């Protein structure tokens, strides 16, 4: 029995590379292969330098490889729509870091347990990971009628993939505020801030609620921040929640861990950290199943 589950990453951009470095610390996952479509890509060269198999043939290079059980897709929403059915036919678990949203929205602090058997999960967006759990926490106590989030990220942290996905980004984030957050209506706005030095990712979450129970709301928000901090240490409340009648304003800042990407790229850090937190649990489950099979075979 292997001690780790083999995985592949499609898309060697900012997110794909940050994922690779985070997964290199995982106790349960071994990144076997990194694939892209540009032979001279810096990401593929970096993956090779770290001993990973690489290919510029895209998804073709991993289809049919039975050893690879989990595939992280860090390409674009349009590309994932093509990849999803191919990965499913090949029996691979897809963790989608694009806003394609083929599978259910996955926000580990809220949905982890119920999704461990899913064959395709969507990591929403960086803003979705940062804001949906807060809306969920407020909704449990106060019934959120409307949620609007403004995610401000450094222009420098937005690579070509993020920029191509802006429309899908706002749409997917708004839907997650409703589906996972529980808001009756959700809206998302993203702002790319060109300031130098680059700013930290900041998320302002406005909610209107039916039952404004201030102490209950503050407690629920603080508890949720604690849960997220376990897998995103740089996640924090910028100021305490501001409660004005039925309006609640929560401001969250996300500082990246600064291992591969700079600390201001908290927007990328939160989605890769969430993907790894979820993937580790899936891999743990697969390893336990492998072990049980071996015990039965030798029993």
Curated annotation (Swiss-Prot):
- Any one of the GO BP annotations: catabolic process
Tell whether Transmembrane is among the UniProt keywords: no
The annotated active site, in chain numbering, is: 126
Keywords carried by this UniProt record: Aromatic hydrocarbons catabolism, NAD, Oxidoreductase
Q: What is its EC number?
A: 1.2.1.10
Top class in the EC scheme: oxidoreductase
- MF (Gene Ontology): acetaldehyde dehydrogenase (acetylating) activity; NAD binding
Q: Which Pfam families match?
A: AcetDehyd-dimer, Semialdhyde_dh
Reactions mediated catalytically: acetaldehyde + NAD(+) + CoA = acetyl-CoA + NADH + H(+)
**Binding positions (NAD(+)):** 157-165, 267
Task: Spell out the family assignment given in the record's similarity comment.
Answer: Belongs to the acetaldehyde dehydrogenase family.
Tell me what this protein is called: Acetaldehyde dehydrogenase
> In which organism is this protein found?
Carboxydothermus hydrogenoformans (strain ATCC BAA-161 / DSM 6008 / Z-2901)
